Design a protein with these regions (language model features):
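Serine/threonine-biased, Pro/acidic-interspersed low-complexity stretches characteristic
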Residues: 2-271
Length: 271
């Protein structure tokens, strides 16, 4: 079991929980700060008069000439979209008639975190995870942005992501990996030089794999190998036991320690 998801039984291997979370009331902060807070009902997935509605998503992140983050994504047509920083500052935009939205957001020192949600019929529908963007200044290259997902592998959002783009692990001994390759091909995964499993990449070329780590994870390092057709890549991951939320650059990789609902920390390593 993934021990960090307290109170919810989740199978080992970063399988997304199918347990429905109870609706709650939260206070939304207005982007300009001159409106009184409003209460809306929160739900991960809701049934509306349009049928079951897909949660909002981030599709790309770029850096503007002013040094801000230009976040592009999809939501319901003309829905009100909110991106909220850990401090509670919210930035609101309205999606177009095609559901596409863009928002310019300030960067934070040490890496930027934003929670994405949209309002629909008086409810706040949250995205599948939290956006993390390492500090970036090159307007000609997309930053190594990822969607952090509790109890699952993070999703790489930048188009130049490698075969091994992200590795996730937690104190309960679960580990997962994701990356980008050609669409619809088989991907072979190795752990410390030993074959582990085979998965298929999606239509966008992104694959995710929950790794069968026998005996759990211990302090030290683990080597992940990925083979896709004639390409092969390995990465070493340092296993740590974080005690607080933070993002740390170690060599070429960002180690992002972040809190998940129910308590505990999950570590996402962005290469």
């Amino acid at each position: 079991m993934i021990s960090l998801l307290k109170g919810i039984d989740v199978p080992m291997g970063f399988k997304l929980s199918t347990v429905a979370l109870c609706a709650a009331s939260v206070v939304l902060l207005s982007g300009c700060g001159d409106k009184a807070p409003e209460k809306v009902e929160v739900a991960d997935y809701v049934a509306t008069n349009r049928g079951y509605v897909k949660s909002p998503e981030v599709t790309s992140v770029a850096v503007t000439a002013a040094g801000e983050l230009l976040v592009t994504g999809g939501a319901l047509p003309e829905a009100r979209v909110r991106l909220t920083s850990p401090s509670g500052q919210a930035y609101g935009v309205t999606a177009g008639s095609d559901g596409r939205f863009q928002a310019s957001l300030p960067q934070m020192s040490g890496g930027s975190f934003y929670d994405l949600a949209m309002e629909t019929e008086g409810r706040l529908m949250r995205a599948e995870g939290r956006l993390f963007v390492p500090p970036a200044s090159d307007i000609g290259a997309p930053p190594r942005s990822v969607l952090l997902r509790p109890g699952a592998s993070a999703l790489p959002l930048w188009p130049q992501a490698g075969l091994i783009a992200v590795v996730d692990y937690d104190a309960g001994g679960a580990m997962a990996v994701s990356g980008r390759t050609d669409p619809g091909i088989m991907v072979d995964v190795e752990i410390d030089g030993q074959p582990a499993l085979e998965v298929r990449s999606g239509e966008n070329g992104v694959y995710t794999a929950a790794l069968p780590v026998r005996g759990g994870l211990r302090s030290g390092t683990v080597t992940i190998g990925i083979r896709a057709r004639d390409r092969f890549e390995t990465r070493q991951v340092s296993l740590r036991q974080p005690s607080a939320e933070r993002a740390t650059l170690m060599g070429v990789a960002w180690y992002v320690d972040w809190a998940i609902s129910g308590g505990g920390l999950q570590t996402t390593v962005v290469f």
